[in-house]
Structures are given as structure tokens and as C-alpha cells.
Amino acid sequence: MDLTNQKSWLQNNGEIYYGPVQISSGRPGQDTPKGTHYVNRKVKDEISYEFNNAPMPYSVYFTNNGIAFHQDDPYVPSAGCIHLYRADAQRYFNDLQIGDKVYVF
């Protein structure tokens, strides 16, 4: 995932097969963590109790502190998560599996 250009894509064996797609990442002070991470949890109908029960459909978590890909406006900065359009969030949710690598730069 390219935070500078706010783009993400899915790869298999080093080949891009979906994307790049528009994303929004964490706002200043709530930055999306860079580095190599791994998918550790998926929740289709997630709700954020930390942020006033905000809906987080198609959440794919890749850190141990609540950072995930999920559906939301990909032009509005987040509290650290990666916002995707609905169709992209659905695709990420369906394609990414527990243990898959997520590289953020």
C-alpha cells in the first residue's frame, strides 16, 4: 500500500491482479503504521465502539491495535485505518485471508 499516493492493490505471486484503487489512510497524528503486517482478523459487519459505534463494513485487520481495511470514504482521512470504496472493501474482504502479508510504505 502506497501512503504517499493513497493507492492500494492486491497481488498474487508478485503480480498485481486487482487495483490500484483509491484509499485514504490515517490523518497526521493518527498515521497508518508503515512496515510489513499480516491479516489477523476479518469482520464483515464491524462496529467501532471507540468511535461512537461507527460502522466499519468489511473490516480486514492487519495490526494488533485495531488498524484495518474497511469501507468508508476513500477521500476522508481516518484514525489510522484504510478507507476503501464499498466494491473495493468487499473484494479485499473476500480475497485476503488470515496470515496474508500487508506491506505499507
Question: What do the predicted segments below correspond to?
Answer:
Residues 1-27:
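Cell wall/extracellular polymer interaction/catalysis modules
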